Amino acid sequence: MLIRLRLKNLYSFKDAEFSMIASSSERIHSHHIYPARNRNDVRLNRFSAVYGANAAGKSNLVKALDFAQRLVLRSLPPEEKIPVQRFLLDPECAKKRPARFVIEIKHQGRLYEYGFECDQDRIYREWLYTFTRKTEQLLFERRTDPNDTTEVELKPTTSLPTKDQEFDPKFLEFVAKGTRPNQLYLRECIERNAKTFAAPYNWFRNTLTILNPTSYPQYLELGIQGDEAYRAFLNQILPASDTGISSLRTEKIKWDTREGELAREALREIPDPQTSALICLRIGSDTRFTIINDEQSTLLKLVTTHRDSNNKEVPFEIHQESAGTQQLLDLTPMMYELMVSKEERVFVVDEVGRSLHPHLARHLVELHLDSAHQKQPSQLITTTHETNLLDLDLLRRDEIWFVEKQPEGATDIYSLHDFKPRYDKDVLKDYLQGRYGAIPFLGDFLSLAPKDTNKSRFTPS
């Protein structure tokens, strides 16, 4: 689970902190909290909504996590630049100071802090700690100087999971010496089969899922075809959401058809497609395929059905559904995981309600928070403009966050809890009135209107 995120000189963040730690002074919605196991553990919120004006930096919070996840999970070619974007509106930050990413996580009952500092050329510093509320223990610290010489400090510990306790300092130092300047030591350890520090890597790989407006969930077609429980969940939630959809199914497409040729052309653009068990293709805005890399290379297409006036099912292509229905479909694998998964899951969604009706967006949040009664080890973090969620009957004060652009262009992030509004306060009204910031300061739009209102600018002269 995500505990805390600290960002320096990264995207629009000059120095910012976001936290999922549950405040001890909050007295409402205690079932939203994932409880601490003991005095050394932390209590964590299961949900956070992040508000702010357009271009204030909400999406950059998601981008920062996405950047770190990609850097951890993927190796860069030796000469490739690190795709980091520093804070560009301060020349000192943009050209001379490295970006800094620090994340605190809870994984398999243990607390870790993992961080790194980098520019486009190299990782200057990288570290991993395990900690409790009172103590911290260094596991490794890697440093790379401007001459690309890498050194690592290693600290043996018995606090790692049993299966990861094989601590061979000579081999780990050898791995550090072979770590390229643009490569994370954490990633290099995994590639060299040194699993001593695998916990944060496994968290980024198996626990964290990031969904942005262009994401396409890979489980949708596969789940419909092979997971009866997931299919039943879909066939309940879609009619209940008033989409008009009576059911979902997949159709097998032959490769020698026009649709098969479209999929084949798109497949040529994917490097090493045989390395993936499942390949999802989105061709323009109209066509979506899933390829299962089995013996037959099965090609699937998702189809919805609606009932006509004679109660007969009529098939529809996905592109014939509304944007809101398509987003709902894209979110259903996440919703299902949040409700039923026994594994730790953290979903970070950029603009969860961008095409959904406000009532439906609220219902999805309620569904996740109600599943908290079942003690699911899951979190949902979303950026949003959906003000229907700004309600203390629904959320805790420390579950509501705001981002605001400062005069120098940097993004500030803070919680509603900092303002300590009364529990009976209409926080939606106060937010729209600007009491908490994070709203746009608009100029005089009326002054932009043409002075001659009798003549349209589009009317031929």
Could you describe each region identified by the protein language model?
Residues 105, 118-120, 144, 404-407:
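Short, low-complexity Ser/Thr-rich regulatory SLiMs
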Residues 82-87, 283-286, 382-386:
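Short Pro/Gly-enriched beta-strand edge/turn motifs at strand-loop
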Residues 113-271:
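Electropositive, glycine-dotted interaction segments
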Residues 1, 96-100, 119-124, 295-301, ...:
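A short, compositionally biased
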Residues 1-40, 44-73, 299-441, 455-458:
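Switch/communication elements of ASCE P-loop NTPase nucleotide-binding domains
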